[in-house]
């Protein structure tokens, strides 16, 4: 069996990239419902739901891009330094695509 690097998995995983991008736009800390709500407002990103955020969370935690904090029953997603750096770059790329190239989905 061939091992696929986390980099390739991240590029293929649009939900993981979406969660990172939305967390960066939400100041690096948010609950799952806040991430889903922010995703619905953009209308250009893939649609998220609780299961998709949970699947993305597993990958992002494993690769140290986010950390999970618990406040009672709520799970708070927090970007790590690596995740914040990657989120900032993704945000710059998305702004370039939307504003300068005027691409639409």
List the model feature ranges, each with a label.
Residues 21, 37, 55:
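DNA-binding alpha-helical recognition surfaces that contact promoter or target DNA
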């Amino acid at each position: 069996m061939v091992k696929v690097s986390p980099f390739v998995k991240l590029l293929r995983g649009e939900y993981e990239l979406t969660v990172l991008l939305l967390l960066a736009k939400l100041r690096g800390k948010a609950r799952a419902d806040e991430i889903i709500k922010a995703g619905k407002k953009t209308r250009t990103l893939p649609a998220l739901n609780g299961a998709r955020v949970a699947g993305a969370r597993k990958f992002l935690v494993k690769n140290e891009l986010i950390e999970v904090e618990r406040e009672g029953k709520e799970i708070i997603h927090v970007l790590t330094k690596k995740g914040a750096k990657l989120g900032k770059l993704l945000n710059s790329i998305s702004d370039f695509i939307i504003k300068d190239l005027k691409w639409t989905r």
